[in-house]
Amino acid sequence: MIWYRWALSLMQLRTVILIDGYFKAGMVDAALTLFKEMSGVAAKPGTLIHAIVLDGLFKDGRTVAAKEMFHEMIKSGVRFSIGTYSVILGGLSKNGCADEAVMLFDKLRAMNLKFDIRTLTIIIDAMFKVGRIEQAQNMFAAIPAKGLVPTVITYTTMTSNLIEKGLVEEADNIFSSMERSGCAPNSRMLNIIIRKLLKKGEIVRAINYMTRVDGKSMSLEASTISLLISLFSTKGIYHKQKDLLPERYQFLEGDIRS
């Protein structure tokens, strides 16, 4: 009997790897077919494989199918890990269902579940999307009290959303607090902030963050450079302010004046 369980475990592991590979390769239907076959064996799929399938469905935009699977998991008594809840909350938020993500989170919080920083970051983003700005800020402020530490992704989520909502000074304060805490911004975070500020017309602030990119020996992403060219070109809305750009980016001058 022991050898049978061992063989079954190996078979399940192989199937999990295959399903994950199918999803990553964009072969969603093949992954779902294999999952259904796996569901028919004696040992039912565990939490990990359910999380993989849910994640794959959400990333492919099959939100309805993901929701149906989630409700079926509840009916079947499948045990949920915090990681699985993170997949569901993130999937809902990224697929136009941020309101549902926030409602689900409120229900989970009422169950006194302990969330990790990834889950809190996801729900903070969802709260911003549904206009619960103050609640998102309070959630962020309460992170240390929960024994957790904000990551670069958490800070990026806060700063980018605050800028999007026009709260640029608050975003600057969050960025400063991040640096004081010893958490260093990465290139992606700085590029996101720069693009958000440029789109909001906060030229001086954007340039300030561009100098930080210089000081940290990082580079602007292609999408950031493209935005700079479109905004500061002859026909761009900020053409008259092109001289404010740091010297390092004067290589754009030919494109800007064309």
Regions found by a protein language model. Give the residues of each.
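Hydrophobic packing position at a conserved site in alpha-helical tandem repeat units
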Residues: 2-7, 21, 31-42, 56, ...
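Short, conserved recognition motifs on repeat-domain binding surfaces
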Residues: 130, 143, 158-163, 174, ...
